[in-house]
Amino acid sequence: PFLAPEYYRKYVFANYKKLFAPLHDCGKKILYTSDGNYSAFIDDVTACGVNGFVMEPATDMAYIAEKYGKTHVFVGNADTSILLSGGREAIEAEVRRCMDVGRRCPGFVMAVGNHIPANTPVENCLIYNEIYEKLARR
């Protein structure tokens, strides 16, 4: 975290509840995203009323899936650095890691955990899709 956890709890999350209230009142769903690893704050974020999480690779997807995978949506969190510079085996291992965690959770959406760099080889993206399609079949 960029700031001490106590600061987030005192100033940030208290305001999130206020910020989210009108959205909840209108029946809207809220997906939370943040740069970096917010695993330590997942209970605080959830208490603010979010309905799901979009995660970067630094966030512990397995931990979040264990705690909230049956009740919340979560999106992520394949590492784009592997997509950028990894070979077929590394890409397959990364997609498999995400799918092995996510397939137990009804609200899982497989996605990369950050932006795909412009210089990512197209072939690597095709490998990612091929492996995902193979593993996504139930």
Q: What are the residue ranges of the model-derived segments?
A:
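Active-site loop segments of alpha/beta catalytic cores
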Residues: 1-138
